[in-house]
């Protein structure tokens, strides 16, 4: 969603409510809504506006304060937020976090931690108090750091948060001065972060030195920047529409089809890969890493990549994503084997007992047995011939990296009875019997 930036915009409750209606035509009633409250002027004003709008419309917002512990005054800020929320009659949740740089600057690390907490809280709508001047600064920072289209498009008014929520920035149409004027008019208190004047931080250098000089030299400089941001956001939105359509075609059969992906131009292939990773919850790697993935998909029949807690596998013309723990021994088999009543231990560990033309007799599942992973010596009768279970898995075209951890059902003497999701031993199978099926071990071909 794009906002129009107008120099004559004045921040009033009516103007704010119009922004709310533009974004949420059905209103916020029934939505779990919160403001990220730092105690600074911008978030103080935003919470006041949302509380006033809520009184008119019949919804009650909450507030969320992230205690980073980076300032010696951090406890004072938390106290201020609690007192301010008490004054407004809204609930406040304060979350203490430990900021670790992990190769990032302190600002970026704090922001990363903050947004991670935002995503975990399960809000339908989380309102952030970024305004028009913040947007200009964000664009200029992206220019200075060599950002691409996504960085130069700066901050969207609305973007996804977690699984089902959204981040909403309703103050983007308004300037820092508009917010000051509103606060003075309503007598709102606030605290000042001492780091906001520290020009050792690049954003503050832009705010206090570079942007004032550019604005003095170039008439309507801020307006020009915002026009650029709006145009770039439109280009980005169009690009994302095209990429989504491309991905739907590449993954149209329910999986990432490498042959289909190869029909695209190099640029579109890169964007499809990036979108595929993002849709699967994988942090998108840098351009060089994406290029390496694309090269292997193009030139080799197989490939494997470790990506921050995930594994990407290229096999048989398809690209697969697994959480790293999925490729370790199943959690329910971490101690090696599970013994007991077969029906009980299978259902307790998320197996579905499905009807199968050649499945296990139901009476057999009422007996004691063993649940474990396959062993090199395991065999099952298939069509009257005993086959090694790993050959059976290979014949089913189970992914090679899943074969060593595949679940097997055995009797109390450890004789294999059935290979999960695949087949039961033919010599003991019955018509319309039972085959144990686990959702984490799909037969993909």
From Swiss-Prot:
A cellular-component GO term for this protein: cytoplasm
InterPro entries: Lysidine-tRNA-synth_C, Rossmann-like_a/b/a_fold, TilS/TtcA_N, tRNA_Ile_lys_synt, tRNA_Ile_lys_synt_N, tRNA_Ile_lys_synt_subst-bd
Keyword check for Nucleotide-binding: yes
EC number from the UniProt entry: 6.3.4.19
Location in or out of the cell: Cytoplasm
Catalytic activity: cytidine(34) in tRNA(Ile2) + L-lysine + ATP = lysidine(34) in tRNA(Ile2) + AMP + diphosphate + H(+)
Keyword terms, alphabetized: ATP-binding, Cytoplasm, Ligase, Nucleotide-binding, tRNA processing
Any one Gene Ontology molecular-function term assigned to this protein's record: ATP binding
UniProt xrefs under SUPFAM superfamilies: Adenine nucleotide alpha hydrolases-like, MesJ substrate recognition domain-like
Pfam families reported in the protein's UniProt record: ATP_bind_3, TilS
Any single GO BP term: tRNA modification
Residues holding ATP: 38-43
Coiled-coil ranges per UniProt: none
Domains as described in the record: The N-terminal region contains the highly conserved SGGXDS motif, predicted to be a P-loop motif involved in ATP binding.
Family to which the UniProt record says this protein belongs: Belongs to the tRNA(Ile)-lysidine synthase family.
UniProt function note: Ligates lysine onto the cytidine present at position 34 of the AUA codon-specific tRNA(Ile) that contains the anticodon CAU, in an ATP-dependent manner. Cytidine is converted to lysidine, thus changing the amino acid specificity of the tRNA from methionine to isoleucine.
UniProt-listed NCBIfam families: lysidine_TilS_C, lysidine_TilS_N
Protein name per Swiss-Prot or TrEMBL: tRNA(Ile)-lysidine synthase
Species annotation: Neisseria gonorrhoeae (strain ATCC 700825 / FA 1090)
Lineage start: Bacteria, Pseudomonadati, Pseudomonadota, Betaproteobacteria, Neisseriales
Gene behind the chain: tilS
